[in-house]
Amino acid sequence: MTIDRTYPIFTVRWLTVHGLAVPTVSFLGSISAMQFIQR
C-alpha cells in the first residue's frame, strides 16, 4: 500500500524535474553552440 502511495509522487517529481531540466539543458546547449559558431 505504501508503494502505491509513494509511486505517483515519485513520477510527478520525475516529470517536473525532467520538464525543467530538459529545456534548460537544450537552452544552454544552443547558447554555447551559437557562441562557438559566431567565433
Curated annotation (Swiss-Prot):
Explain the purpose of this protein: This b-type cytochrome is tightly associated with the reaction center of photosystem II (PSII). PSII is a light-driven water:plastoquinone oxidoreductase that uses light energy to abstract electrons from H(2)O, generating O(2) and a proton gradient subsequently used for ATP formation. It consists of a core antenna complex that captures photons, and an electron transfer chain that converts photonic excitation into a charge separation.
**Could you tell me what this protein is called?**
Cytochrome b559 subunit beta
Q: Could you tell me the keywords of this UniProt record?
A: Chloroplast, Electron transport, Heme, Iron, Membrane, Metal-binding, Photosynthesis, Photosystem II, Plastid, Thylakoid, Transmembrane, Transmembrane helix, Transport
Which Gene Ontology MF annotations are present? Answer: electron transfer activity; heme binding; iron ion binding
Binding-site list for heme = 18
Q: What is the lineage of its organism?
A: Eukaryota, Viridiplantae, Streptophyta, Embryophyta, Tracheophyta
State if Ribosomal protein is listed as a keyword.
no
Q: How does it assemble?
A: Heterodimer of an alpha subunit and a beta subunit. PSII is composed of 1 copy each of membrane proteins PsbA, PsbB, PsbC, PsbD, PsbE, PsbF, PsbH, PsbI, PsbJ, PsbK, PsbL, PsbM, PsbT, PsbX, PsbY, PsbZ, Psb30/Ycf12, at least 3 peripheral proteins of the oxygen-evolving complex and a large number of cofactors. It forms dimeric complexes.
Q: Does the keyword Electron transport apply?
A: yes
Cofactor binding summary note: With its partner (PsbE) binds heme. PSII binds additional chlorophylls, carotenoids and specific lipids.
What sections of the protein cross the membrane? 14-30
Gene name linked to the record? psbF
Main location, first listed in the record: plastid
Q: Where is this chain's protein located in or outside the cell?
A: Plastid, Chloroplast thylakoid membrane
| UniProt cross-references to Pfam families, sorted A to Z | Cytochrom_B559 (PF00283)
Assigned GO CC terms: chloroplast thylakoid membrane; photosystem II reaction center
GO terms in the biological process aspect are: photosynthetic electron transport chain
What does the sequence similarity comment in the record state about its family?
Belongs to the PsbE/PsbF family.
List the membrane topology term(s).
Answer: Single-pass membrane protein
The cofactor(s) it depends on are: heme b
Which cysteines share a disulfide bond? none
